[in-house]
Curated annotation (Swiss-Prot):
KW NADP (keyword) present: no
Location of this chain's protein in the cell: Cytoplasm
Name listed for the protein in its UniProt record: 2,3,4,5-tetrahydropyridine-2,6-dicarboxylate N-succinyltransferase
Subunit structure of this chain's protein: Homotrimer.
Enzyme Commission number(s) of this protein: 2.3.1.117
Function according to Swiss-Prot or TrEMBL: Catalyzes the conversion of the cyclic tetrahydrodipicolinate (THDP) into the acyclic N-succinyl-L-2-amino-6-oxopimelate using succinyl-CoA.
Pathway: Amino-acid biosynthesis; L-lysine biosynthesis via DAP pathway; LL-2,6-diaminopimelate from (S)-tetrahydrodipicolinate (succinylase route): step 1/3
Organism, scientific name: Sulfurimonas denitrificans (strain ATCC 33889 / DSM 1251)
GO cellular component entries: cytoplasm
Amino acid sequence: MEIIQTTEAFKALVQDIKTSINGYKEPLAFGVCRVDMGQLNLEKTLQATYPVINWNENFGSAAIFIKALQEQGVEIDFTQSEVICNINKAFLKSCLNAFSPYSEEAYGDAHKNIQVISALYNQIATSGSKDGEFKVTFIFADEPLKSVEATYLKLYALSQAKVEIRSINLNGAFGALPNVAWSNGKPLELDYLREFEIELKLANEYPHIEFVDKFPRFLQHIIPADNTRILDTSKVRFGAQLAAGTTVMPGASYVNFNAGTTGAVMVEGRISSSAVVGAGSDIGGGASILGVLSGTDGNPITIGKNTLLGANSTCGIPLGDGCIIDGGLAVFAGTKFHINDAELIELKKVNPNTKFDNYMKGWELAGLHGLHFRQNSLNGQYVVQRSTREIKLNTDLH
């Protein structure tokens, strides 16, 4: 592409690209990434790092990327759910020519895609690059995942809150991602470590392996909000979503991918895959929220606002606002609870559309507000009462 002089000419170019390319389709998501390739299998992508991702936005930049690829002889198949293409210095130069009207404005939070293209062009011009080290990824449909690059793009979208938890298709992610050893943020093929174990150890070059997993850690890719605290990097998996003000303590805490918080939450327990916790809630030490793969029959759990899960409790049903599960208590869908007549009256006040009985199972109480799950210490009976206290976090800590 030639150098574009004005914003009007840029807009005209974008429109021409969209109308002239056969079957053109705007991507759901796209971004430029650097990939880590295998140490033995040089064609195998182990990790994709995106400085900027776009989700249902910045379609003009996408059009320029697609046109620049076309100029390099790359034809995009818009019928595919995901497309990954290698990019080079010529691609970057063509994009910069098209972005010229906006180049002086591309700093801070403005025109992030132009900043990426400019920085990468300068980096390659100075230091060069390996073949296939940099790629552009397009997702055209929210379908099961096929590649590492597209999987990482969706995980970024979750962790950067571009999309809501549980709102995108992550089927295929486990199959697409390789199981690798991680050392200082770098993925290493296990086969490579096995094959060169002797040489690496004799040369005192065997890497310090921090963990082995398909997913990296959240903080390897995401910069959290200023008032978010994560006291142990191993406690949050990449693909988790943490709202501003969330605190993840060390010890028994854990937040899985496609799970997280929608407001300031104290996390000292486990938030399993697809579980969502509302603002002001407290997940006590060792408490567990079951995930779709761990006992909920595939039904994801949402915890409402200002709810307390006591230490070492287990929650297997969705909860509304202002609920309490006492420490050590396990609440499952099939667990039967007693509610006395006086408590029934109080519970109906905050759940007016619910039909209550003296004995109800956990699934019948799912999503209701103001529930206090307890166990009678005299007879062992599980009971539900109206929660009489509002759960509030210490604002100084969040």
